[in-house]
Every structure is written in C-alpha cells, then in structure tokens.
From Swiss-Prot:
NCBIfam families per the UniProt record, alphabetical: PRK00349.1, uvra
Name of the gene: uvrA
Localization, UniProt: Cytoplasm
Species of the source: Vibrio vulnificus (strain YJ016)
Record family assignment: Belongs to the ABC transporter superfamily. UvrA family.
InterPro entries: ABC_transporter-like_ATP-bd, ABC_transporter-like_CS, ATP_grasp_subdomain_1, P-loop_NTPase, UvrA, UvrA_DNA-bd, UvrA_inter
GO molecular function: ATP binding; ATP hydrolysis activity; DNA binding; excinuclease ABC activity; zinc ion binding
Gene Ontology CC annotations of this record: cytoplasm; excinuclease repair complex
Protein name: UvrABC system protein A
Lineage: Bacteria, Pseudomonadati, Pseudomonadota, Gammaproteobacteria, Vibrionales
Major localisation: cytoplasm
Subunit structure: Forms a heterotetramer with UvrB during the search for lesions.
Binding site residues for ATP: 31-38, 639-646
Cysteines paired by S-S bonds: none
C-alpha cells in the first residue's frame, strides 16, 4: 500500500475531513495557529499509529506502555508504527546530558574501557603490568656497552635507622645498595638518622649492555621483582643519566598507585563505580552563597543587612548582640565597614572559640550559656538539612548557589576515570569539546595494532552519531551540556539525530516544527536530514511554517481557513505548485507573494543618549561582549544557532535587569563587568514559552485575570444576591461552589493496569466542575460552566458591554488566540500559545511606557498571517515608548525591526561576538554576517 487513507477525522476542531496521504514521502502540514494541524498530525495520525502498535503487544507488555486515546475518526488505513518527535519533553534530570541522550557517551565509555591507557594521577606515568621478557627487551634496547645496574627498591621514603633491613640484605649475599641516592657497601653501611625519611634500593646486578645478556638479565629481574614486590629500576652506574622504572604489577612504579580493571561503568557518572564521591556525579555542589545571604552590605546588621537576623528577629539578634560584645564590633555600623575577620566570624562561625551568649525569654528571665557561634551560613545549612517543611526549604533555596565540584572540577567522574587517556586525551576533555571539534578529533585519531582493531566498530558508531548531530545544526553544543539547559528546538533536533542513528525503515515520523531556534543557514542541513529519513523508506510528517520546509516537501496539506471553530478543514493539498495555484490557500498567497509582511517605510530613529550599556559579558562562549540596546525601539538579536544570543539576553541582560528593576533575589546573571542605563525602565518582563501553569486548574481565564471580574459579575446577579453567593462561590479551586466529588477537576482518574489511566467525566457534575446550586445561577442566560467553555472570540461578543473583561479578551484576540477556550487547561497549550497568553496579559495592563520586554522566539508555532498580527502588537508596545528586545531567526520579524544586533560569526567557540549592529539596511551590507546574507534579499 502506497498511501494512508483518512476518512471522517473529527478530533478536536477537525470537521469530518477526508485525506489521502502518500507514504514514504516528506509531507508538510501547515496552516494558521490553532487551525487543527496538531490535531491531524499528533492527535489523529500519530495517536492511531501508536495505539495500533501498542495494542498488538501482550497484555503484560501493555501495562508498561501508555496507550494513546483512540482518536475520533471513522477509518484510517495504511498506517505504520509511529514515532513522534516533539519539543515538549526536555528532560529536567540534571544527570541527562547531550552525550547520554544521543548515546554517544555510552560508546565513549566503551572505547575508553577497551583501549584507554590508565595513568598515575601524581606521576602521569602509564599503569601497565610488564612481563620479565618485556623488561629484558627494553634494557637490551639501550646503547651497547652502557654500564647499568639493576636495583630492587626495599624501603621507600620511610623514617628509621633500618639496621635490621640492611643486615638481612647482607646476609642474603647482596654486596651493594643505593641509600638515599648514594651507592654504598653493605659490609659497612652508613648510619641512618632515625627521624629522617630514607629510600633503600639493593643492587641486584651490575652489567654492560650486550646482546647475549638475556638469560642473566631475566634471572636478575626475577630476583629484583621478588625482593621489592614487583618493582625494578635500571639506573646508570656513572653520572646522572635517565632511570627506567619497571613494574610487574598494574600499578605506578613510583608510588604504587593501582587501579581496578577498566570497565565501561568506571566512566559512568550515573554509576557509583564511576561517579565522583563528593558531588555524586552531578558535577556541581550547592552552597549557601554569602552574596545572596547579605541583602544589602550598605546596611547595618541592626537595619537588616542579613534578612532574618535584624532587630525584628529577637532570638537571632540576641545572639548577634552577644557576638558583638565578645568581638567588640558595632551592630549599627554598615556591614561592609566591618573588618574581613568579623564578617568571616558572622558568616562562618567562631570555630572552637566559645562565647558567652545571653538569652532573654518572654518573661524577661536571663540565661547565660557558653558555646561556639555556629555562623549564619552554617545555621542556614543545618536548617535546610533538618527541616521537613517545604515552605522553609523554598525560603532557604533563595540563598543557595551552585559551583563546580571542588573534587572533580565539574567533570562528574572519580579520580581513576579522569586519568585514563587515549592519545593524551581524557574522557572529560572529549565531552567538553564542541560536537564539531569532537568529530574532528575522532576523524584524525590514529590507534595502532590491536587497539585499532578493537576500537574500529566503536569509533564508527561515535563518528556516525556526531555527524548526525552536526547535520541537524547542533555542531556548537558540548557533549557535557546538561539536557535541562537545552531549548525546545535543540532537544527536538537531538531526538531527531538519535532517530537517524537508529536507522529504522518503514516508520511514520511525526515532527513538530523542527526548524525552531535554527538560523536560515542551518535550515538546509536540517531539511537534508529530513529527506534522508524519507529516503531510508519512512513517511515523514512535519507540522511546519518555515517557507523553505514547505517548498522542500513532496506533499503539502494546508489546514484552515481560520483558527479554532473557523478551521479544521483541508483548504488545499498537493504539490507546491498546486498550493500556489489555489486561491483559497492563505499559505499559498504568502508563498506566491500575493500577500506579504511589509518592510516599514521608515524606522524609528535611535536616540544616542538613551541606551542601556552592558559591558564585559563573558558567560558560556561570550567573549567580553559590550551590548548597547537602544531605549524605546524594537530590537532584534540575531545570529546562527549557538552564537550566544540566549546567554547574552536571557542569562545576562534579563537576569541583571530582573534583579535591579524587579528586586529578584534568585536570578544569577552570567559573568559581566558593569551595566548602566537601567534607570530608563521601571520594570522588565520576560515573555518566554514556559507553561502558564502545570495543572489542568490553570487556564487562560485565571492567568490573564479575566476570571475574577467574571465571578464578580455572577455574584452580582439577582439570584446570587438572594442566595448570598460571593465571588468565591464561582471558583472551582475552593470549597463552596465546586463539585466536591471531583474537587472541581470535572474528571476522575481511574487507574487501569493494562491500559492508560482513564479520566472519566465526574458522575455528579458531568464534567462541569461546579455543584448543581452554583450552575443554577445564570448571567445573560449562561451558567459559569458555559462561559468557561466559550472561545475567546465568542466571549468577546458576549461580554462586549463589560469593558474590564472585553479589553482583556481583545488583547487575546490581538495576539491571535481567538480560538482558545477560556477554561482550556494550561497543560494543553503549546509553548507558542502559552507565550502569547503571557503577552496578552502584559498588553492588558496599564501601560507606563517605561517597560523593557524580552521575548525569545515569539514566532514559534506561528503562520505568516499570525506573525503579521504579532508584529502589530509588538510595534504597538514600541509606539507607547516601551523597549522590545526579541531573539529571533524569522526574517519577516527581523526585517521589520528598528535595530539589529547580530552575534557570531559561528556557533559555540566560533561565536560569542557582536559582528554587526544597526538598522536592517545597515546590517544587510555587513560582510561575514550570515544573517546579512539572508536578510538582504528581503529588503528589496
């Protein structure tokens, strides 16, 4: 069968659609945000493909796998087992790294266990057990006629006179020994000092190097090794020539350091055999940070330099008073004026020094006690360790920072694993390389003999996987990069690379916008990867808005014509030419140029006196970057993937502004030197793609604040007043008006062992969340449940006479969310939708004209038409005097910006510099900027 037949698909907003999709092709599903693309791709095709595959397994196997809900569709045939590669499921496990997710690290562990060379951490010499034959051969390689002696170390750096030892050696017939570097006669040994460390090596043989010495040397080595426990030394009889140390043990010949046999688990930081004992393989240690604990060093302790230890907290302040009396310092002097030693005592304690503390209880009784002062940092640490209260822990977490582990230096591995080498390179050094550099390392790695044979297959797997990561545009990442720091797009492309590595055939892959976070330059490589996946014999279904991806597809499906209830139909399908020729296709109109996002005729001019200057940003790969952001403009931060955009804006600029403008205490900016110009703003708002809530109780109505005035409206009706209902009656989060059978959830979870957990509508409220009495109250003929089921568009019309609600609903429509329901669970919103709900909430607030807005790729999940709407909103914010800073790859957004700051020139270590800045017209002329190359044609 060469096609997938879909008949009568009605999942979510799909309107009974019929489709014939070619198999083993690259198919792009496009359309407006909310038109039903994901409903078709993920909730219908993927869900049914996955469900049928899992259903074919035994009942025992099914209990370990989650079974997808059966989609609302009459008939689908021609499906393959389905694999979905989404953006959502980035691991939050601190033990997951790029290396472990892609399995490259597993192959590296195997490689180091099989061909690695262990060395002594102190002497850097290889640990290798040598046979007597190897030792003899090594000696015979020395210049012919060289006068040498064979020594057996008996005493190594030990105190004592060692009279008995020397007598025993003489009794065994040995004539000479080397004591502390001097050769002497055992018939008349020197007297050794009792309290000094001595080294005694007995001379087993003296000889001139000749080819016929094999037998004699073998016997001498045997004697020496037996005497010393496996160590022998060859030293020149005259002069200070180089000595050769031999070991018959798997140990360092100098200090005896030995290691267990190399196994892959020794190199795993998730296994006790390989993890650093101090940080348990996490690579970082948590500690109470003095910089966070000291709230304001300009204040005195009495005024609250350290929160919780001021005059308001009587118990702790009593302790500080006694401490001040003992060390003679002033509690009313600014903390930063106290001597370093006093500050140290306050923070870290008095050590063993006992202090007399005066404690006064509520009745005024005085009690004197002598004990050392624990120190504020140690007190916080003890409280954090001992408490069982979550609220106390949450409060104390504010004062905790992380630093690289002092034992392993952040490598996560124990000492033994850190000292195994392949051609002078350790495993921690490999994983710190960028993927591109690691690929170069293995491509040029030369091993010899048996080691080359052993490593051949493993290195092929490593090279293939690294090449796949480069092909999806991730050449700038390190293998040691923690998975929780990856963006959604990066995580998705890593999973894509892993799938290519698996080399499956006959599978249906469903991808959700793989081009997110990818610069135009890297897009071509991604598309080649997708076509490669298709050419292996797979059906590749991609939900995508990127123009290049749509043009590259074998078959395009355009869902529309609008969003939500106005969508759910197949507007156009077929080849690229058929889409362009279809007058009903909004996508086709934008691709053909009939519709387009217009380049502004003039840019808002920059006021050179109103800028924010960030000096010396050096986090991650940034190279002492000086950032200048114009105030009151719409600025775009551009650059290839991994060039340092997120580090500069999210990790440095936003966190500094968040701390200084919003008073945040937990934001830890990346390293920088100074910042000036933040006085132009009254607050900073970061509108990111994190969920608006992590439970189904969170929804757009509660998040944007619309639900409160709606509840007040219901409580103001005649029926409510006569019953005495207050606004709280209409909340599904508190007792009173909600259905207690399901506690306001509307559904009840039923655990099924062989099947997925089933959520059934509550029997009592029938999924309406409220009890019968609450639902009897109507506003304009609608109950509270019916209002929550309305789309934003319907609600806007319904609440038009209520300005406070209508205004907030209008902002949701302005950002293209007319189709979402007011009570839609936050967990069902995509990252792009969550970001736009946040944007709508900010738009609905009273505007001061002095706000700094920071957005990271707001075009995620947006069609050309949606981008037009978003730009209208962002330009409106700018026109009110606010400053908008957007990290973006989308050229339609970049070309409408007032100012561009382009980072590069490459990703990873090849980036981290500002290579161009100015208006789009200025930047387009810059040589060496990848952004300029793609932007130039857009401005014509």
């Amino acid at each position: 069968m060469d096609k997938i037949e879909v008949r009568g698909a009605r999942t979510h907003n799909l309107k009974n659609i019929n489709l014939t999709i070619p198999r083993d092709k690259l198919i792009v599903i496009t359309g407006l945000s909310g038109s039903g693309k994901s409903s078709l791709a993920f909730d219908t095709l993927y869900a049914e493909g996955q469900r049928r595959y899992v259903e074919s397994l035994s009942a025992y196997a099914r209990q370990f796998l989650s079974l997808m809900e059966k989609p609302d569709v009459d008939h689908i045939e021609g499906l393959s087992p389905a694999i979905s590669i989404e953006q959502k499921s980035t691991s939050h496990n601190p033990r997951s790294t790029v290396g472990t997710i892609t399995e490259v690290y597993d192959y590296l562990r195997l490689l180091y266990a099989r061909v690695g060379e262990p060395r002594c951490p102190d002497h850097k010499v290889p640990l290798a057990a040598q046979t007597i034959s190897q030792m003899v051969d090594k000696v015979l390689e020395l210049p012919e006629g060289a006068k040498m002696m064979l020594l057996a170390p008996i005493v190594k750096e030990r105190k004592g006179e060692h009279v008995k030892t020397l007598e025993n050696l003489a009794a065994q017939g040995f004539i000479r020994a080397r004591i502390d570097g001097e050769t002497c006669d055992l018939t008349d040994p020197p007297t050794l000092e009792l309290h000094k460390k001595h080294t005694i090596e007995v001379v087993v043989d003296r000889f001139k190097v000749r080819g016929d010495l094999q037998q004699r040397l073998a016997e001498s080595f045997e004697t020496a090794l037996e005497l010393s426990g496996g160590i022998a030394v060859i030293a020149p009889m005259e002069g200070d020539g180089e000595e050769i140390v031999f070991s018959a043990n798997f140990a360092c010949p100098h200090c005896g350091y030995s290691m267990q046999e190399l196994e892959p688990r020794l190199f795993s930081f998730n296994n006790p055999a390989g993890a650093c004992g101090t940080c348990d393989g996490l690579g970082v240690q948590q500690y109470f940070d003095p910089e966070r604990v000291i709230q304001d060093a300009n204040l005195s302790l009495a005024q609250g330099a350290i929160r919780g230890w001021d005059q308001k907290n009587y118990y702790y302040f009593q302790m500080l008073t006694s401490l001040a009396e003992h060390y003679d310092f002033d509690l009313h002097a600014p903390f930063n004026s106290l001597s370093k030693r006093i500050q140290e005592v306050i923070l870290k304690g008095s050590g063993r020094t006992e202090i007399e503390f005066k404690y006064i209880n509520d009745r005024g009784d005085i009690r004197l006690k002598r004990h050392p002062f624990e120190g504020i940092l140690n007190t916080l640490e003890r409280r954090y360790r001992d408490t069982e209260s979550n609220s106390v822990r949450e409060e104390l977490v504010k004062y905790i920072s992380t630093k690289p582990c002092t034992s392993c230096g952040g490598t996560r591995l124990r000492l033994e694993a850190r000292n195994v080498f392949i051609n002078d390179t350790t495993l921690p050094q490999i994983v710190e390389l960028s993927i591109a550099d690691a690929l170069t390392f293995f491509a040029t790695l030369k091993l010899e003999g048996q080691r080359a044979q052993i490593a051949e297959k493993v290195m092929k797997e490593i090279n293939d996987r690294l090449q796949f990561l480069v092909n999806v545009g991730l050449n700038y990442l390190n293998l040691s990069r923690s998975a929780e720091t990856l963006s959604g797009g990066e995580a998705q492309r890593i999973r894509l690379a892993s799938q290519i590595g698996a080399g499956l055939v006959g599978v249906m892959y469903v991808l959700d916008e793989p081009s997110i976070g990818l610069h135009q330059r890297d897009n071509e490589r991604l598309l080649k990867t997708l076509t490669h996946l298709r050419d292996l014999g797979n059906t590749v279904l991609v939900v995508e808005h990127d123009e290049d991806a749509i043009r590259c597809a074998d078959h395009v499906i355009d869902i529309g014509p609008g969003a939500g209830v106005h969508g759910g139909q197949v507007v156009a399908e077929g080849t690229m030419a058929e889409i362009l020729a279809n007058p009903d296709s909004l996508t086709g109109q934008y691709l053909s140029g009939a519709k387009q996002i217009i380049v502004p005729t003039q840019r808002t001019p920059r006021d050179k006196n109103k800028t924010v200057e960030l000096i010396g940003a050096s986090g991650n790969n940034l190279k002492e970057v000086n950032l200048s952001v114009p105030v009151g403009l719409f600025s775009c931060i551009t650059g290839v993937s991994g060039s340092g955009k997120s580090t500069l804006i999210n990790d440095t600029f936003f966190k500094i502004a968040h701390t200084q403008l919003n008073g945040a205490t937990t934001a830890q900016p990346a390293p920088y030197k100074s910042i000036k110009g933040l006085e132009h703003f009254d607050k900073v708002i970061d509108i990111d793609q994190s969920p608006i809530g992590r439970t189904p109780r969170s929804n757009p109505a509660t998040y944007t604040g619309i639900f409160t005035p709606i509840r007040e409206l219901f409580s103001g009706t005649q029926e409510s007043r006569s019953r005495g209902y207050k606004p709280g009656r209409f909340s599904f989060n508190v007792r009173g008006g909600r259905c207690e059978a399901c506690q306001g959830d509307g559904v009840i979870k039923v655990e099924m062992h062989f099947l997925p957990d089933v959520y059934v509508p509550c029997d009592v409220c029938k999924g309406k969340r409220y009890n019968r009495e609450t639902l009897e109250v109507h506003y304009k003929g609608k109950s509270i449940d019916e209002v929550l089921e309305m789309t934003v568009e319907d609600a806007h019309e319904f609440f038009a006479p209520v300005p406070v609600i209508a205004r907030k609903l209008q902002t949701l429509m302005d950002v293209g969310l007319s189709y979402i329901r007011l009570g839609q669970a936050a967990t069902t919103l995509s990252g792009g939708e969550a970001q736009r709900v946040k944007l709508a909430r900010e738009l609905s607030k009273r505007d001061t004209g002095k706000t700094l807005y920071i957005l990271d790729e707001p075009t995620t999940g947006l069609h050309f038409h949606d981008i037009q709407q978003l730009l209208t909103v962002l330009h409106r914010l700018r026109d009110h005097g606010n400053t908008v800073v957007v990290i973006e790859h989308n050229l339609d957004v970049i070309k409408t910006a007032d100012w561009i700051i382009d980072l590069g020139p490459e990703g990873g270590q090849g980036g981290g510099e500002i290579i161009a800045q100015g208006t789009p017209e200025d930047v387009a002329q810059i040589e060496g900027s990848h952004t300029a190359r793609f932007l130039k044609p857009m401005l014509k």
